[in-house]
A protein has these predicted regions:
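Donor nucleotide-sugar binding/catalytic pocket of nucleotide-sugar-dependent glycosyltransferases
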Residues: 150-156, 160, 174-216
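Aromatic "clamp/platform" in nucleotide-sugar-dependent glycosyltransferases that forms part
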Residues: 293, 312
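Short hydrophobic beta-strand element within catalytic cores of glycosyltransferases
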Residues: 329-332
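N-terminal strand-loop element at the rim of the active site
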Residues: 13-16, 33-104, 201
Length: 405
C-alpha cells in the first residue's frame, strides 16, 4: 500500500462564511485512504468547528500565531518574551489604521509585510501539499512559513472586489504552484489582473453536497416564519459586501407600498449594531429579523418563498448553490459574477440599489406564477456536485504545468 500524502489546509477560522462552508464540504468528501489531512486555524473558533470530520487532524495553534490573532489575552501570556508578539500586533494594527485610502484587507497586507512576517516563526512540520484556503493572510502564512513540496492558494471572490492590493499579492502568486478560484469569471479576472501568473490560475468549483443539505432541511426552524406573510430569507455575514443595508432600505420601501412580509437574515458580523439601528429607525422590527448564525440554516431555506441575495460582490456563492438544491427561487443583485450561477429560468437579477431590489420583490409578490415556474425548473435538476472532487485530486496529483480546462 502506497504511503499517504501529507496535506495541510490553512484558514483563519470556521465562522459561517462561504469559504469556510465549502472547506467543510470538501473535507467531508475527501479520500482519507490516500491523504493524511491536517487543518490549521489562526483562531480555533466558528460555527462549523464541530463539523470538521474526525479523520482530520485539527492542529494546535502555534503560540506565536495564536498571540497575533486571538480575541483575548486572558491566560495567554506565558513568559516575558510573549510581550513582543502582543506589542507587534498592537503596533502593527494601530499604525496601518492611519494609512490613507486603504481597505481593511489592504491594511492587513501591509501589517503582514511590515510587522507579522518577521515576527511569526516558521511552522514546525513539513508537508507534501500546503493549501491556503483563503486569500490574504492564510496565503502569506502558507507561502512564507510552511515547508511543503507544493503550495496552492485559493481566492474565493472576484479579486477586483476584495480590496486587496495586487502589487502586494503578485510576488506571492508567483511563488505559489497554483492560484485556484471558484468560477470562470473569477478566473478571468485573476488572469487579467496578474498576467505574469496567468498560467497558474485554476478554476475549481466549491463542493456542494445535495443529500446532506436535504437531510438537514427536513428539520423545523427554531424561529419559524409567520404564515400570513411573504417569506424572504437572506444568509450571509453582516458586512458591507452582503449589502444588507440595501436590503433594509428595500424592506422599508415594500412596507410603505403596503406589503406584508417577513424577511429573516441569518448571519453575524461587524455591522450588526448598525443594521439593528437601521431596522429600528425605519420601524421594521415586525418585518425584518436578524436571527444570528444558525448551525443549520436549511430548514429556513426550505420554508421561505424565495432567497434574496443583495451582495455587492461574490465569487461563486455557496448559498445560491444550496438554494438551488432545495429548489428555491432566487432574487439577486447584479454583481459581476452573478450570471455564472443564475439566469431568468430560476431567479430574478435586479439592480444593485434598494429601489431595484424592492421592485423585483414586488414583481414576485404580484406574480406567484413566476415563483412557481422557477421552482418547477429547479426541481428538474440535481445541483449537487460532489463529483467535482476529482478536480481537486487532479490539482493535488498534477505537476502543475499549466491551467486546467
Amino acid at each position: 500500500m502506497s504511503q499517504k500524502r501529507k496535506i495541510i489546509f490553512v484558514i483563519v477560522s470556521l465562522y459561517g462564511g462561504g469559504a469556510e462552508k465549502s472547506l467543510i464540504n470538501l473535507l467531508h468528501e475527501f479520500d482519507y485512504e490516500k491523504y493524511e489531512v491536517d487543518l490549521l486555524l489562526f483562531k480555533k473558533e466558528g460555527l462549523f468547528l464541530n463539523q470538521v470530520p474526525e479523520q482530520v487532524n485539527l492542529l494546535e495553534i502555534p503560540h506565536d500565531l495564536d498571540l497575533m490573532y486571538r480575541n483575548s489575552y486572558k491566560g495567554a501570556i506565558r513568559r516575558i518574551s510573549d510581550l513582543q508578539y502582543v506589542l507587534t500586533r498592537f503596533l502593527g494594527t494601530g499604525l496601518v489604521k492611519v494609512l490613507p485610502h486603504k481597505s481593511v484587507r489592504a491594511r492587513r497586507q501591509v501589517r503582514w509585510k511590515k510587522f507579522y512576517r518577521n515576527a511569526i516563526r516558521p511552522f514546525d512540520r513539513e508537508y507534501d501539499i500546503a493549501v491556503a484556503y483563503l486569500e490574504c493572510e492564510p496565503t502569506y502564512y502558507v507561502l512564507d512559513k510552511i515547508r511543503a513540496g507544493r503550495k496552492y492558494v485559493w481566492v474565493h471572490n472576484d479579486y477586483d472586489s476584495t480590496g486587496l492590493d495586487s502589487k502586494y499579492d503578485l510576488p506571492y502568486f508567483r511563488k505559489a504552484d497554483a492560484v485556484v478560484t471558484i468560477s470562470d469569471k473569477c478566473a478571468n479576472i485573476l488572469r487579467e489582473r496578474f498576467p505574469e501568473a496567468a498560467e497558474k490560475v485554476w478554476c475549481i468549483p466549491n463542493i456542494t453536497t445535495s443529500k446532506y443539505i436535504r437531510e438537514l432541511a427536513a428539520d423545523e426552524p427554531d424561529e419559524p416564519f409567520r404564515e400570513d406573510r411573504f417569506k424572504i430569507l437572506s444568509i450571509g455575514r453582516l458586512s458591507e459586501q452582503k449589502g444588507f443595508d440595501m436590503a433594509i432600505k428595500a424592506a422599508n420601501l415594500l412596507k410603505k407600498r403596503g406589503y406584508r412580509f417577513e424577511w429573516i437574515i441569518i448571519g453575524e458580523g461587524e455591522l450588526k449594531n448598525e443594521l439593528t439601528e437601521q431596522i429600528n429607525r425605519y420601524g421594521l422590527n415586525d418585518d425584518v429579523r436578524l436571527v444570528g448564525q444558525k448551525s443549520n440554516p436549511y430548514p429556513y431555506m426550505r420554508c421561505c418563498d424565495f432567497l434574496a441575495q443583495t451582495s455587492r460582490y461574490e465569487g461563486k456563492s455557496v448559498v445560491l448553490d444550496e438554494a438551488k438544491i432545495l429548489s428555491k427561487p432566487i432574487l439577486a443583485t447584479q454583481y459581476p459574477t452573478v450570471h455564472d450561477q443564475l439566469d431568468d429560468k430560476i431567479g430574478l437579477i435586479v439592480g444593485m440599489n434598494p429601489e431595484a431590489i424592492a421592485d423585483g420583490m414586488e414583481r414576485l409578490f404580484l406574480h406567484p406564477e413566476l415563483l412557481e415556474g422557477m421552482q418547477r425548473e429547479l426541481e428538474q435538476h440535481d445541483f449537487g456536485n460532489t463529483h467535482e472532487i476529482s478536480c481537486y485530486y487532479e490539482l493535488f496529483e498534477s505537476d502543475v504545468s499549466g491551467e486546467n480546462e
